[in-house]
């Protein structure tokens, strides 16, 4: 984190994912290399898409936008050439073209620090887009969907985004949120995929 290179890995490390501190309540900063992004996170994303399409051959996820709700990142206070942040923010900052081209909102909005402002900006900039897929943690995604319903004066997210078919979620168990999402998105055609993207 302080800028020393090639200590444990042969290539340069400039990203450090802040862990949630689940093992002892303290956050840790885990190095994230270009190779880890490519061989773990993006490869995992491709695997998830391939599995989804193998189970749903008529899926149309790539016919419209993907709303990705992630965390934030900032300059590393120990080394100005590096960054620290949520793993989701590191992934968003470095997405390959095949994923970035479909993603919404803009990177500037997606990586905002203030969650209340971020939710408001995402709601206003995406509510009129053609969203086919969402990805994020259930809690903040639910807050976002409720705000969009308020802004649009709609009863259900399917009124706003009729082509929405998939929600990739992780970070926490989906079980406590399932009923609430079923009310927000009352559609038997809606698919939910739980994934845990470890730092």
Please report, for each region that a protein language model flagged, where it lies by residue.
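Active-site phosphate/ATP/adenylate-binding loop shared across adenylate-forming ligases
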Residues: 1-199
